[in-house]
From Swiss-Prot:
Identification of the protein by name: Phototropin-2
InterPro entries linked to this entry: Kinase-like_dom_sf, PAC, PAS, PAS-assoc_C, PAS-like_dom_sf, Prot_kinase_dom, Protein_kinase_ATP_BS, Ser/Thr_kinase_AS
SUPFAM superfamilies (UniProt xref): Protein kinase-like (PK-like), PYP-like sensor domain (PAS domain)
Bias (Polar residues): 41-51
Organism: Oryza sativa subsp. japonica
Needed cofactors: FMN
GO molecular function annotation: ATP binding; blue light photoreceptor activity; FMN binding; identical protein binding; protein serine kinase activity; protein serine/threonine kinase activity
Induction remark: By white light in dark-grown seedlings.
Residues with the S-4a-FMN cysteine modification: C139, C425
Domain Protein kinase: start-end pairs: 576-863
Sequence similarity: Belongs to the protein kinase superfamily. Ser/Thr protein kinase family.
Region (Disordered) location: 28-84, 332-363
Length: 907
C-alpha cells in the first residue's frame, strides 16, 4: 500500500506540473473559430446542446435500436422545423459554398435543435439523402446502432460550450450502410463572441482508417498497427476545414477551387510501374519532374499552373508558441500585391502599404489561422509516402499478422485498412492460387529468407490478378528477425497466355522493382521504434545519463548539475522548482525552472507520452533526445539531463533570456530588422546549420520561433523533434586558382564539406517554410535547410514570408508555383535579394549550398563583412527596439519565501 501511495503521489505531482487543460473535445481544433459580421438573434447554450442528443430511430431501411436517428421524411417529425420557418442563406453564400469540394453542412446555432441551413452536394452523395430530407433537420439522423455514444457526448459537449470538435465516429447512410466519418465541427461567432452557426465537415475515411482495429493490442499493450491514423486524418481535415470557414466568413472573396488534381496524385498503370525502374528516392525538380515511377509522391504532386496572385489583405500573425500561451505580442502585417516575376536586379514595383491596411487585421487571419500556421506539422513518415503495394507483418505475434498496409495495397486489393490490420495475408488466396507456390512462401517464412514468386491472388470483389510477390525479412541491429516485408506488383497485363505466367523479361524487370521497393521500405521502417518494445522501453533513452561536453563542462550550469548528481541522487522532476511557463505546443510545454538550492535557471521541455504515442511521435522524441546529446556548440543548446515521469518525458536545456527571435522581430518598427541585424542573425544560423549538417543532422524546422537569443544577443537554434539524423559524408574540395592568383602566389585552401549522406521523405516542417521537394515527395536532403534560410532572411527583411496563402493548400501551391517577388516599398540591398533568390531555387540542385554546403553561402557577397571565425566574439548590431531579457524578475511579485506558481490558465 505504501508503494501504491508513493506512486499516486508521483502521478499527482506530475499532474500538478503538467495537467494543462485541453481545448475541448476537438483537441487541436479548438482554434478553428471565426467571427462573423452580423449577429442574428441568439439562442441559449441549451438549444445547442440539445441539437446533438440522439432521438428515437425512424429512418426506413435502418436497423432500430442503439443511438438511432431522426426521421428521413419531410413531415413534422422530431427535430424537423416547418418548411415555412426554415432558416435561409443568402444566394451569395450559396454560390460561394457550392464552389467548394469539401463535404459539409452549415447549421443555425441561433435556433432550437441547430437545424441544417445548407448542405454541400458531397453530403447528399455521401449519405444518400436528398436536400428535402436534410435541410431543416439536425445531423443526428446519421447516427445508428453502433455509433459510439461517448463520441456523440463529446460532440454535444463541444456544441454546448461553443467549441470545436474533430473525431471519428460510425455513421449510417440512408440505406443503412455504415461508414466511418471523420467529423469536424467548428463554431462561427458574431462580433460579440456569440455562436451563430456551426460548420460540420465530413470526410469518409472507411478505406484508410484502422477503425475498430485500433483496439487490437499486442502482448506489450501497444496497438497492433504500426501507425496510428486518426491524428493523421485529423490534421488533414483541419487544414481542409479552413477553406470552408473562410468562405462562410467572406463569401464574396471565395473563388472556385483549382482542379481536383490539386489534391490527387497521378495514378500509374502497372505497366508504367514495371517499365520505370528509377530508384524510390530520386532527385527531381519540385515543379513536377524527376519523380519517375519510383519516386515518392504526395497528395500535392500534380499541382497545375494557375495565375499567380496575392491577396491584398493585411494580417496579423503570432508565434506558434506564444499564440498558444496567450501572449499579446502585437500585430504583424502581411501585405501582398500583384507583382511581376522577380528580377533580382530590378525588383518589381509594388505600391507601398497604406498604414490603415497594415494596422487592419482580419479576424480569421489574426485569431484562428495564426494559431496553427506557425506550428510544425508532421503529416507523414517516409514509410507512409512510399506509393507501392506492400505490407509489413510481425512474425513475433501469433499468425504473423499485417501491422502496416500501404494505401496503394488497399487500392489494389479493394480491402479497407480496418479489414486487414491484424490478419494474415492468406485472405488474398482463391480457387486458382497455386498451393505449391504458397508452400514456398511458408517455407521462406519458416527459414527467414527472402523469396520472389508469382501467383494468382484475388481482390475483395473476387477479381483475380497475377501477383509478382517479393518477401523479405527485416532484422534488427542484433540480427534478430523483426518484420517481414511483402511487396506486390500486379502483372496481369503482362501474362503470356501459353505459359500462363509473366513473360521472362517482365519477370526479371519486375523482380528488380519489387526488391528495390523492399529495400526502401526496410530503410523507412527503421526510422520508427520497434513495435514490440515494452512501453517503458520506448522512452529508455530519456533515462540515460548525460555527460558534459568539452566546451561547456565548466560553466555554472554544468557545475550545479554535477554537484546535484554527486550527492548520489538521480536528477528528476523533484529537483527543479517551477518559475513560470515559457511556451506550449501541440505535444508538450516548456517551463522556466530553477535547480533547487543552486539559483541556476534552465528550460525544461516536457512532452506528454500518451500524446506522443497517439500522434506517431515517439521516434521523433527519441531522435530529439539523441540529437541534443551530440551537440557542443555556442549556437546550439546544451542538454544537461533528461528524465521521465509516469506521464511525461523531460529535457533540461539552456534557458535563453532573450526569448524567441520571432518576438524580437515583432517588436521592431514595421516588424522588420535593419539589414545589418538580419545579416548577423542569418550568419549565425548558417554556422549552426553547418555544424548540424556536419553531424549528419537535417534540421527541417528553421523559423524565427525556433531561434532563441542568449543574454549577449547571440542565437541558439532549438527544437529538434522534426529533425532527421543520419550519417555525414565528409570530403575535401580542392579549389582551383586563377592565373592572377597563381602569379601573386595567393592560393585558396581546400574546402572541407560534410553533409548528411542519406535523404529522407517525411512530410514535416512548418507550413510557410517547407521546401518544394518536401511537398512533392521527391525525397529531400540538407538542401531544405538552405531553402528555409532563404524564407527566414526574407521574413526578417520584409516582415512576412513570400509564399504564404490563405490556407495550407494555397500556401503549398504558392511554394511550388508562385513567382518570388520583392516589394519595392522596403529598401533591401541587391546582394540580399540575390542571396534570397539563390536560396529559394525550387530545384535543389540549383540551390545555393547544394554543392559545397555552408561554404557556398558564406562566400556570398551579402556576408562579405562577416568575420566567420570570430563571429561568436562579435557584438550583435543594435536593434531599433533593444532586446528585452526575461527571467525570474519579470514574474509578478510574490511574497517572500513564497514559490511562484505556474499559471496553468496560460495554457
Amino acid at each position: 500500500m505504501a508503494g501504491s501511495s508513493s506512486s499516486k503521489e508521483i502521478v499527482d505531482a506530475v499532474e500538478k506540473w503538467m495537467a494543462f487543460p485541453t481545448s475541448g473535445g476537438g483537441g487541436a481544433t479548438a482554434g478553428l473559430e471565426i467571427v462573423a459580421e452580423d449577429a442574428p438573434s441568439g439562442s441559449s447554450g441549451a438549444h445547442q446542446q440539445q441539437a446533438w442528443r440522439p432521438v428515437a430511430p425512424a429512418t426506413a431501411g435502418r436497423d432500430s435500436g442503439g443511438t438511432g436517428s431522426g426521421k428521413s421524411s419531410v413531415d413534422g417529425g422530431v427535430g424537423r422545423a416547418s418548411h415555412d420557418s426554415l432558416p435561409r442563406v443568402s444566394q451569395e453564400l450559396k454560390d460561394a459554398l457550392s464552389s467548394l469540394q469539401q463535404t459539409f453542412v452549415v447549421s443555425d446555432a441561433t435556433r432550437p435543435d441547430c437545424p441544417i441551413i445548407y448542405a454541400s452536394e458531397g453530403f447528399f452523395t455521401m449519405t444518400g439523402y436528398s436536400p428535402r430530407e436534410v435541410v431543416g433537420r439536425n445531423c443526428r439522423f446519421l447516427q445508428g446502432p453502433d455509433t459510439d455514444a461517448a463520441e456523440v457526448a463529446k460532440i454535444r459537449d463541444a456544441v454546448k460550450h461553443g467549441r470545436s470538435f474533430c473525431g471519428r465516429l460510425l455513421n449510417y447512410r440512408k440505406d443503412g450502410a455504415p461508414f466511418w466519418n471523420l467529423l469536424t465541427v467548428t463554431p462561427i461567432r458574431d462580433d460579440n463572441g456569440k455562436v451563430i452557426k456551426f460548420i460540420g465537415m465530413q470526410v469518409e475515411v472507411s478505406k484508410y482508417t484502422e477503425g475498430l482495429s485500433d483496439k487490437r493490442m499486442r502482448p506489450n499493450e501497444l496497438p497492433v498497427s504500426l501507425i496510428r491514423y486518426d491524428e493523421r486524418q485529423k490534421d488533414k481535415a483541419m487544414s481542409s476545414m479552413t477553406e470552408v470557414v473562410q468562405t462562410v466568413k467572406q463569401p464574396r472573396g471565395a473563388r472556385a477551387p483549382a482542379d481536383a488534381a490539386l489534391l490527387t496524385p497521378p495514378k500509374m498503370s502497372d505497366a508504367d510501374k514495371m517499365a520505370a525502374m528509377s530508384p524510390v528516392v530520386a532527385p527531381g525538380t519540385p515543379s513536377g519532374g524527376g519523380g519517375g515511377a519510383g519516386s515518392f509522391k504526395s497528395p500535392l504532386w500534380d499541382l497545375k499552373k494557375e495565375e499567380s496572385r496575392l491577396s491584398r489583405l493585411a494580417s496579423g500573425r503570432k508565434s506558434g508558441r506564444s499564440s498558444l500561451m496567450g501572449f499579446k505580442i502585437g500585430k504583424r502585417s502581411s501585405v501582398g500585391s500583384r507583382e511581376a516575376p522577380a528580377v533580382v536586379e530590378e525588383p518589381a514595383p509594388a505600391p507601398p502599404p497604406a498604414p490603415e491596411v497594415v494596422e487592419r487585421t482580419d479576424s480569421w487571419e489574426r485569431a484562428e489561422r495564426e494559431k496553427d500556421i506557425r506550428q510544425g506539422i508532421d503529416l507523414a513518415t517516409t514509410l507512409e509516402r512510399i506509393e507501392k503495394n506492400f505490407v509489413i507483418t510481425d512474425p513475433r505475434i501469433p499468425d504473423n499478422p499485417i501491422i502496416f498496409a500501404s494505401d496503394s495495397f488497399l487500392e489494389l486489393t479493394e480491402y479497407t485498412r480496418e479489414e486487414i490490420l491484424g490478419r494474415n495475408c492468406r485472405f488474398l488466396q482463391g480457387p486458382e492460387t497455386d498451393q505449391g507456390t504458397v508452400d514456398k512462401i511458408r517455407e521462406a517464412i519458416r527459414e527467414q529468407k527472402e523469396i520472389t514468386v508469382q501467383l494468382i491472388n484475388y481482390t475483395k470483389s473476387g477479381k483475380k490478378f497475377w501477383n509478382l510477390f517479393h518477401l523479405q525479412p527485416m532484422r534488427d541491429q542484433k540480427g534478430e528477425l523483426q518484420y517481414f516485408i511483402g511487396v506486390q506488383l500486379d502483372g496481369s497485363d503482362h501474362v503470356e497466355p501459353l505459359r500462363n505466367r509473366l513473360s521472362e523479361n517482365t519477370e526479371i524487370q519486375s523482380a528488380k522493382l519489387v526488391k528495390a521497393t523492399a529495400e526502401n521500405v526496410d530503410d523507412a521502417v527503421r526510422e520508427l521504434p520497434d513495435a514490440n518494445l515494452r512501453p517503458e522501453d520506448l522512452w529508455a533513452i530519456h533515462s540515460m545519463r548525460v555527460s558534459p561536453k568539452p566546451h561547456k563542462r565548466n560553466n555554472p550550469s554544468w557545475i550545479a548539475i554535477e554537484k546535484a548528481t554527486n550527492l548520489g541522487e538521480k536528477i528528476g522532476l523533484k529537483h527543479f522548482k517551477p518559475v513560470k511557463p515559457l511556451g506550449c505546443g501541440d505535444t508538450g510545454s516548456v517551463h522556466l525552472v530553477e535547480l533547487q538550492g543552486s539559483g541556476e535557471l534552465f528550460a525544461m521541455k516536457a512532452m506528454d507520452k500518451s500524446v506522443m504515442l497517439n500522434r506517431n511521435k515517439v521516434h521523433r522524441a527519441c531522435i530529439e533526445r539523441e540529437i541534443y546529446a551530440l551537440l557542443d556548440h555556442p549556437f546550439l543548446p546544451t542538454l544537461y539531463t533528461s528524465f521521465q515521469t509516469p506521464t511525461h518525458v523531460c529535457l533540461i536545456t539552456d534557458f535563453c533570456p532573450g526569448g524567441e527571435l520571432f518576438a524580437v522581430l515583432d517588436r521592431q518598427p514595421m516588424k522588420i530588422f535593419r539589414e545589418e541585424c538580419a545579416r548577423f542573425y542569418a550568419a549565425e544560423v548558417v554556422i549552426g546549420l553547418e555544424y548540424l549538417h556536419c553531424l549528419g543532422i537535417i534540421y527541417r524546422d528553421l523559423k524565427p520561433e525556433n531561434i532563441l537569443l542568449q543574454a549577449d544577443g547571440h542565437i541558439v537554434l532549438t527544437d529538434f523533434d522534426l529533425s532527421f539524423l543520419t550519417t555525414s559524408k565528409p570530403h575535401v574540395i580542392k579549389n582551383s586558382t586563377s592565373l592572377k592568383r597563381r602569379r601573386s602566389q595567393e592560393f585558396l585552401p581546400p574546402t572541407f564539406v560534410s553533409e548528411p549522406s542519406t535523404p529522407s521523405n517525411s512530410f514535416v516542417g512548418t507550413e510557410e517554410y517547407i521546401a518544394p521537394e518536401v511537398i512533392t515527395g521527391a525525397g529531400h536532403t540538407s538542401a531544405i535547410d538552405w531553402w528555409a534560410l532563404g524564407i527566414l532572411l526574407y521574413e526578417m527583411l520584409y516582415g512576412r514570408t513570400p509564399f504564404r496563402g490563405k490556407n495550407r493548400k494555397k500556401t503549398f501551391y504558392n511554394i511550388l508555383h508562385k513567382d518570388l517577388t520583392f516589394p519595392s516599398s522596403i529598401p533591401v540591398s541587391l546582394a540580399a535579394k540575390q542571396l534570397i533568390h539563390g536560396l529559394l531555387q525550387r530545384d535543389p540542385s540549383n540551390r545555393i549550398g547544394s554543392n559545397a554546403g555552408a561554404n557556398d553561402i558564406k562566400q556570398h557577397s551579402f556576408f562579405q563583412d562577416i568575420n566567420w571565425p570570430l563571429i561568436r566574439c562579435m557584438s550583435p548590431p543594435e536593434l531599433d527596439v533593444p532586446l528585452k531579457l526575461i527571467g525570474k524578475e519579470t514574474q509578478p511579485k510574490a511574497k517572500p519565501d513564497e514559490d511562484v506558481p505556474l499559471n496553468l490558465d496560460t495554457f
